[in-house]
Amino acid sequence: MPTTNQLVNRGRTSKVQKQNAPALSWSYNSLIKRSKKMPSPFKRGVCTRVATMTPKKPNSALRKFARVKLSNGMEVTAYIPGEKHNIQEHSVVLIRGGRVKDLPGVRYHIVRGTQDVAGVNNRKQGRSLYGTKKDKK
């Protein structure tokens, strides 16, 4: 327990909150060759590797993921949501924040239905997150 004198001299420092998606908060300025803190909801990138991964202990599956080289120079691992995908090695993708709880090190999601990524086929409910257009009747 600090004394009153110690608190008067130093004061209490507030805890620094850790960011969940740090790659989204930096932008690269190619003119001055320097990164700048400029948060954005999405970032564009190019896939360098597309593969599958097995989840942590109680779960069992083959989860699809991609290594993405972002426009700010960082390389991150992003999850590919939904059934089936058309993402290949040099596909341009858009990523958003949001971790996958049972995949260690995966803190980002790929946005379906934008850039080179197609939406999920034959999806009727919850289409917004999977980039699926409304059916023509």
UniProtKB/Swiss-Prot annotation:
Q: Can you supply one Gene Ontology CC term for this chain's record?
A: small ribosomal subunit
Does the keyword Protease belong to this entry? no
Q: For this UniProt record, give its keywords in alphabetical order, as a comma-separated list.
A: Methylation, Ribonucleoprotein, Ribosomal protein, RNA-binding, rRNA-binding, tRNA-binding
MF (Gene Ontology): rRNA binding; structural constituent of ribosome; tRNA binding
**By its UniProt entry, which PROSITE patterns does this protein fall under?**
RIBOSOMAL_S12
> Which InterPro entries would you find in this protein's record?
NA-bd_OB-fold, Ribosomal_uS12, Ribosomal_uS12_bac
> Where do the record's region annotations for Disordered lie?
1-20
Coiled-coil intervals in this record?
A: none
Q: Where are the transmembrane segments?
A: none
Task: Tell me which domain of life the UniProt entry assigns to the organism this sequence originates from.
Answer: Bacteria
- Which GO biological-process labels does this protein carry? translation
Q: Which residues carry this modification: 3-methylthioaspartic acid?
A: D102
Which Pfam families does this entry report, sorted A to Z?
Answer: Ribosom_S12_S23
Q: Could you say which protein family the record assigns here?
A: Belongs to the universal ribosomal protein uS12 family.
Under HAMAP family, the record lists: Ribosomal_uS12_B
Kindly state the subunit structure of this protein.
Part of the 30S ribosomal subunit. Contacts proteins S8 and S17. May interact with IF1 in the 30S initiation complex.
Q: State its role.
A: With S4 and S5 plays an important role in translational accuracy.
* Protein name per Swiss-Prot or TrEMBL: Small ribosomal subunit protein uS12
Source species: Mycoplasmopsis synoviae (strain 53) (Mycoplasma synoviae)
